[in-house]
Amino acid sequence: MNRFKASKFRHMEARPSRREAWISDIRAGTTATCGNHIKSSCSLIAFNSDRPGVLGIISLEGHEENKRHVTYLGCHSDLVTDLDFSPFDDFLLASGSADRTIKLWRLSSTGEALPSVPGVVLGPEELPVDVLQFHPTADGVLVSTAGRTVKVWDVAKQQHLTELEAHKDLVQSAVWSRDGATVGTACKDKQLRIFDPRARAQASQSTQAHENNRDIRLAWTGIQEYLVSTGFNQMREREAKLWDTRVFSSALASITLDTSPGSLIPLLDPDSGLLVLAGKGENQLYCYEVTPQQPALSPVTQCILENALRGAALVPRQALAVMNCEVLQVLQLSDTAIIPISHRVPRKAVEFHEDLFPDTAGSVPASDAHTWWAGDNQQVQKVSLNPAHRPHPRFTSSLLPTLEPSPNMEQPAELPRADTELSEGFSSPSSLVSPSTPSSLGLSLSSTSGIGTSPSQRSLQSLLGPSSKFRHAEGTILHRDSHITNLKGLNLTTPGESDGFCANRLRVAVPLLSSGGQVAVLELQKPGRLPDTALPTLQNGAAVMDLVWDPFDPHRLAVAGEDARIRLWRVPPGGLKNVLTTPETVLTGHTEKIYSLRFHPLAADVLASSSYDLTIRIWDLQAGTEQLRLQGHQDQIFSLAWSPDGKQLATVCKDGRVRVYDPRSSPLPLQDGPGPEGGRGARIVWVCNGGCLLVSGFDSRSERQLQLYMADALAEGPSALLGLDVAPSTLLPSYDPDTGLVLLTGKGDTRVFLYEVIPEAPFFLECNSFTSPDPHKGFILLPKTECDIQDVEFARCLRLRQTSLEPVAFRLPRVRKEFFQDDVFPDTAVTWASALDAKAWFKGANGQPRLLSLQPPGMTPVSQAPREVPARRTPSSAQYLEEKSDQQKKEELLNAMVAKLGNREDPLPQDSFEGVDEDEWD
């Protein structure tokens, strides 16, 4: 702005809209990421919800008198760190996450029928994705950052075109210049860098940006050579700087605001040159005009906000109310609402003002990824914002197919919002088969009511592949009244082969750090704060290696010691009252310390143990003797598991092999196959009714992964492999045979993965993962009978913290909870009653578990519930009146008034009055 020429924006006013225009009743969530937490296209708004991995989607404009409803898109299994709409396709959304992937989503025009699987998956990266942005001129080009890495992606080919030179620290911002030729980055090493990604991977220019390395953001102006950065100076004051890339050694201009700790979000409109600075956690917006002349950063206006700002976004210029002289609209994301803030220049005439609204870039891309990478520099054709020159041609990207539901298609019920608390964790689903083979899937609709799907839905599902009915599962830490607190002296260094603690429906056994291998036994029916005095314990006499409850006797506990002995303890029915020093039975036979213990799933008094002597021994507890000894392992045995029918035993070993034994027929393995490459630890569990084996372990790069084997074809290797993340602890699987769900988490993790495992492709169906507020030391699945069936609780677990024990409930949102959800709760096996005794099993007999219905008395199965008839929607009065002419409205109004008055023949009130007599007139 020339100092001798008044700015056309000098009288601009910024005002929050009326409450009627707010998008309320939302629950926004923010994290310490480089993103703005909210983005807008000309049609839709997307924002971070309070559930990790879940985005809220809502229409930008309300329709008639209808209230806008937020729908939720389950994007990732961890926090969404950044998101962006395509500048050309209003319904193409990209999301980046802490789960190290970038996903592209095709949204519907209404924003209601949301996809359950992404259209494209990019990655995974080595670190969480921090920033992403679509290219401003070419369709299908995306820039992203992850840690110190910056990549430019060809979305159509699902591969990166180039990886820019590694930065020296975390990349905090990456933005395209308006012509799409260069990329500007801001790094935690305080450097600004300019890249020409098509020329070379090294930076063409660099300079020091701000003296403080905290949260530097960038925004490119409408003039190619100018760049705005925001950050903090050495005095921790917030500041903004304007840079001329032709003279990049120092800033062209700078302004200092205040010492507030909230990071500045720069929102710059390249057409008008208006810069809005929004501070996270604050209630004020600053607006400046950016010009190449001095003063280069001129204050225009400020706006006081009613609520604290959690995120902010600009509405595209093509969606502005230009006839009202609205030159900017900022969407403020608060904790409970999205508030439009309109910036208007007062003008007397209600007309289109060309000086306020120059032509802007249209919605048709100038090129695609291939032509742009080949050197094409065509610019997007500009269009007028004058309403008289609209509509402009719209563009639909071919990157993802457009799948709109037919008008008569049943829409999935909106996911009810859970009454979540701060202690809850919720992460959303996506269907990944393998990180190395990203899926290219579109919209997938499935019923969440438990009643069934329409033929059109089934045909769509057959086209796009299956999705889990548990994908919207919600994990909740139950109320504090059910917690056991004030735990002290826990042994948090149990071997990796042990779960760290064990539980049944009555009590929990937790090893303590004190000498002598002490084990505390806590009653689940007596929650609350434990006394500060010492608890009565089991004096094992040797350090505890593993411990497990007898599934058929809730009072018997087996404890494996470092002295190669197995001790069987009997806990009194009311719990421990005194210290127990003498076990019921001591089993001796192993020559080295023991890895793990596993009870037989059907036969009473049968126990398997693995040891450092590289053998597995099977014990008859009734006789107190070793009956079988399995051999063939060449190294440490990581894990063992009984098959559901109790006939076979599977192991995974440090020698990189998975083995299956038939213990009663041979001490050598029946078959074996290749196992995980990493030697840090592994677990094995039978899934899919015993038809498959699931192994969790590490690959050669120490990435945690899942491998699924066909139980009768181990030699062929895994049928499916799924990489998860990089973490030091082994994933401990807890499998629920009724639902086919496996819960996976490690000691010291804060996240529990949920997958539905099926025996055919895609094998793993990802569901919402559970995120806890702090790391847990163990995670145990309780028997199905502990679940609240009426609340559609399909799993209940115990979470061990350093000082407390917390129950966690996993529920499935259902609309008609008054019915028994028989599709979620099939008859369950009676795991607490044996099918045969040890003597019969060792002689070759087999048994079958009894089945128990979980249907509560008086509840009707949802499969037998009457179908709900959808209410017929009648047009609103406003819509009805709009369809009539003025003359018709006038006639109807007069008729209504006449009808109200009516032609009544009733006597008038004065007719009943009595007059005076005739003689009184005289």
UniProtKB/Swiss-Prot annotation:
Processing after translation: The membrane-associated form is phosphorylated on tyrosine residues.
A single MF term (Gene Ontology): actin binding
Q: Subcellular location, in the record's words?
A: Golgi apparatus membrane; Golgi apparatus, trans-Golgi network; Cytoplasmic vesicle; Cytoplasm, Cytosol
Q: Which residues carry this modification: Phosphoserine?
A: S459, S462, S912
> Is Protein transport among the key words of this record?
yes
The keyword Nucleus appears for this protein? no
Composition bias type Basic and acidic residues, residue spans: 881-893
Annotated region described as Disordered, given as residue ranges: 386-462, 854-922
Q: Residues involved in crosslink (Glycyl lysine isopeptide (Lys-Gly) (interchain with G-Cter in ubiquitin))?
A: K469
Q: Name one Pfam family in it.
A: WD40
Which cellular components does GO assign to this protein? Answer: cytoplasmic vesicle; cytosol; Golgi apparatus; Golgi membrane; membrane; trans-Golgi network
Q: Which UniProt keywords apply?
A: Actin-binding, Cytoplasm, Cytoplasmic vesicle, Golgi apparatus, Isopeptide bond, Membrane, Phosphoprotein, Protein transport, Repeat, Transport, Ubl conjugation, WD repeat
UniProt superkingdom: Eukaryota
The family assignment reads: Belongs to the WD repeat coronin family.
Q: What functional role does this protein have? A: F-actin regulator involved in anterograde Golgi to endosome transport: upon ubiquitination via 'Lys-33'-linked ubiquitin chains by the BCR(KLHL20) E3 ubiquitin ligase complex, interacts with EPS15 and localizes to the trans-Golgi network, where it promotes actin polymerization, thereby facilitating post-Golgi trafficking. May play a role in the maintenance of the Golgi apparatus morphology.
Query: What does the subunit comment say?
Result: Interacts with clathrin adapter AP1 complex. This interaction takes place at Golgi membranes and not AP1-positive endosomal membranes. Interacts (when ubiquitinated at Lys-469) with EPS15.
- The identity of this protein, by name, is Coronin-7
This protein's species is: Rattus norvegicus (Rat)
